[in-house]
Amino acid sequence: MKIIETENAPKAIGTYSQAVKVNGFLFISGQIPLDPSTMELVEGIENQINQVFENINQILKADGMDFSNVVKLSVLLEDLSHFEKVNEIMASIFSKPYPARAAYEAVSYTHLTLPTTVRV
């Protein structure tokens, strides 16, 4: 087991690692739209979705990977009306064959350390 960390993605704000590599598989912790330079949430749903994927990109890069190595995503949205924007942004990031994906509408994250409308 190897811990993968980068300063180009938000620091863990709890008892977890940014990513863990086991037997060639990289498991990335759920990312929220934090700007790693300020550790503040970015504003606006499109900016939030882009920031989440940029955080994932930086963690992948820290292990010499890119989005072509992603095989599964779980997308959690506070409001599924933003799902089309997620699809639009993912289409600009991923190429066929697309990764497997599950998407969920999650009740408000306000009870968590940092409330947000999107997690991947």
Predicted regions and their residues:
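Glycine-rich phosphate-binding loops at beta-strand->alpha-helix junctions
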Residues: 74-81
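Phosphate/pyrophosphate-binding loops at sites that engage ATP/ADP/AMP, CoA/4′-phosphopantetheine
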Residues: 59-70
